[in-house]
């Protein structure tokens, strides 16, 4: 019976983890995530007010989501709209992973407000186009 393992207490992995933590602290990455994450949520809440197919917006830091629904009262998921918004935004240069009726976002932790706004502008344009296609506007 061995008292050690290949994955526990690996000095190289520990050094890499410590170096990563030091960079996060020195470059104030968490502060950026808090500030820009709050900006994301502010913008997304405004989008929710202005778009009939946005049922809800959720997020903390840089883990964000926009829920697309057919009706805000019933909250019926709108998968078709999610697919089209994803495709339109991707064609405009926004790279992300489709997730049905949830527009899921997890940008790099170093993203600033300018790039956040660029991405949200693309998403909002794409949502507006999809709403027109489905007769919501």
Q: Could you describe each region identified by the protein language model?
A:
Residues 1-137:
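Conserved N-terminal phosphate-binding loop of PLP-dependent enzymes in the Aspartate aminotransferase
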């Amino acid at each position: 019976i061995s008292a050690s393992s290949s994955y526990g207490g690996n000095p190289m992995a520990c050094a890499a983890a410590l170096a990563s933590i030091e960079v996060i602290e020195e470059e104030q990455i968490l502060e950026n995530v808090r500030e820009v994450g709050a900006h994301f949520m502010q913008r997304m809440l405004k989008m929710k007010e202005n778009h009939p197919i946005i049922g809800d917006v959720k997020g903390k830091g840089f883990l964000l989501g926009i829920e697309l629904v057919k009706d805000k009262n019933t909250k019926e998921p709108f998968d078709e709209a999610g697919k089209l918004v994803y495709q339109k935004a991707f064609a405009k240069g926004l790279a992300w992973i489709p997730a049905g009726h949830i527009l899921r976002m997890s940008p790099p932790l170093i993203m600033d407000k300018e790039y956040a706004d660029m991405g949200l502008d693309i998403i909002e344009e794409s949502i507006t186009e999809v709403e027109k296609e489905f007769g919501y506007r």
